[in-house]
UniProtKB/Swiss-Prot annotation:
Belongs to the THF1 family. This is Protein Thf1. It comes from the Bacteria. May be involved in photosynthetic membrane biogenesis. HAMAP family: Thf1 (MF_01843). GO terms for cellular component: plasma membrane-derived thylakoid photosystem II. Keywords: Coiled coil. Residues 174-202 form a coiled coil. GO terms for biological process: photosystem II assembly.
């Protein structure tokens, strides 16, 4: 049985394993993921499904794009997992294997495969919902389909998996918004750096 750690315990463990300063742009993302993993560690019904593993690895990858130094990312991910009793190696392996299963497939093929997991007794979480969404979004024909039809397909799959579409829709919306805000913040930082260089040359 996993040890139930408080958020303070998890933060202490995290900083012991990751003794580096986290750039301000990424600090909120890291804090939110740490708290979320800690809370999931407390849920007795929680099951670490392969779709959850995809959600964790892929959202981490997307939300930490542009992180410097890049070589810290591996330790950062491992520290986040270890600090709440999750096993980073197993999570990465499960994610890689699962992504291979759904690779180069159409939306229809992915939909059939995902719906086969309807008896898996999935534990609803933001990370799981995003794992499902990111697999669907990787479909070869996803970009060719209009938004209303995309939403209907996502809704059908989520409902078939006995999960809440309203919650999934909210999680997906917040995730997309976070990605957009990160991109905008990075652009502003880049512009500020260019401006600063020009000022110094004067």
């Amino acid at each position: 049985m996993k040890e139930k750690l408080t958020v303070s315990d998890s933060k202490k463990l995290f900083h012991e394993q990751f003794p580096y300063v986290i750039p301000g742009l990424y600090k909120r993302i890291v804090d939110e993921m740490l708290v979320e993993l800690n809370l999931l560690n407390h849920q007795n019904e929680f099951i670490q499904d392969d779709l959850f593993c995809v959600g964790l690895t892929e959202t981490f990858k997307e939300l930490t794009k542009g992180y410097k130094p890049e070589e810290h990312l591996r330790v950062l991910f491992e520290s986040l997992c270890n600090s709440s009793n999750f096993e980073p190696k197993k999570i990465k392996e499960a994610s890689k294997k699962t992504l291979e299963v759904y690779k180069d497939k159409s939306l229809k093929e992915i939909s059939i495969l995902l719906k086969q997991k309807s008896d898996s007794n999935l534990y609803s979480s933001r990370i799981l919902n995003l794992g499902i969404y990111l697999i669907i979004a990787n479909a070869t024909d996803f970009k060719d389909i209009k938004d209303p039809e995309k939403n209907k397909i996502i809704s059908d799959i989520i409902n078939k998996l006995n999960l809440s579409f309203n919650k999934a829709e909210k999680d997906i919306g917040i995730y997309k918004s976070s990605i957009l805000k990160m991109e905008q913040a990075k652009e502003l930082l880049q512009e500020a750096k260019i401006k600063d260089k020009k000022e110094k040359k004067k």
